[in-house]
Amino acid sequence: MVYGLTLLLLFAACGEDKPQPLSIQVVPAKQIGDTKGSEYANWDTVEFTGGGGVTYLVASEPLLTEWNIVACKIADGGSQTKIVAARLNAYGSKKMQEFSENTVNLKQPLGLKIGDRWANFNPLLNQVQDRIQLRGFTAAEAEQFQRDLADR
């Protein structure tokens, strides 16, 4: 009897609906007018309504995902947005260092995709070491992302 109740409680606990972890992607991007050549053939087109409605091409592979972030702090970004100051794992840090060491990539936009929403396309202004600021989170997204990191 006790064994049966234990199994029942275990199955009930496993059946709880937990919210899906928030997906984060940082992706190289270019304004569509700045893209010439076959290297952009596999990039996707994004109509970004923020910032005056600009069309971007974004790389098919992200530079970073939520799995490259090991810790974060949340700051107020103004205009009802939040900034996530993220510390990167070794793989993400190495990848961003290599990307940002190429001066051609500096001052070029990086697309930030949060879930299914393109949050912004801010330029990469400085070389990245092991930390990066991600702008454009809503308060709810920033809080959920912080919980997701704590639950890993």
Label each residue range with its predicted role:
Residues 1-12:
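Sec-dependent bacterial lipoprotein signal peptides
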Residues 14-152:
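Structural signature of multi-pass, alpha-helical inner-membrane proteins
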